[in-house]
Amino acid sequence: CRVENKCPHTVCCDRSRCSCKLIRTRPLMYHVCVC
């Protein structure tokens, strides 16, 4: 599991082509690894 540079340390990706995206859902905001 590797951590993306644009993501918090709690979000990591297992694949090299994964990218981190910020999901905005009121009232929460969180990062998700999208492969």
From Swiss-Prot:
<keyword id="KW-0964">Secreted</keyword>
<keyword id="KW-0800">Toxin</keyword>
<feature type="modified residue" description="4-hydroxyproline">
    <location>
        <position position="8"/>
    </location>
</feature>
<protein>
    <recommendedName>
        <fullName>Conotoxin Ca15a</fullName>
    </recommendedName>
</protein>
<dbReference type="GO" id="GO:0005576">
    <property type="term" value="C:extracellular region"/>
</dbReference>
<dbReference type="GO" id="GO:0090729">
    <property type="term" value="F:toxin activity"/>
</dbReference>
<keyword id="KW-0379">Hydroxylation</keyword>
<keyword id="KW-1015">Disulfide bond</keyword>
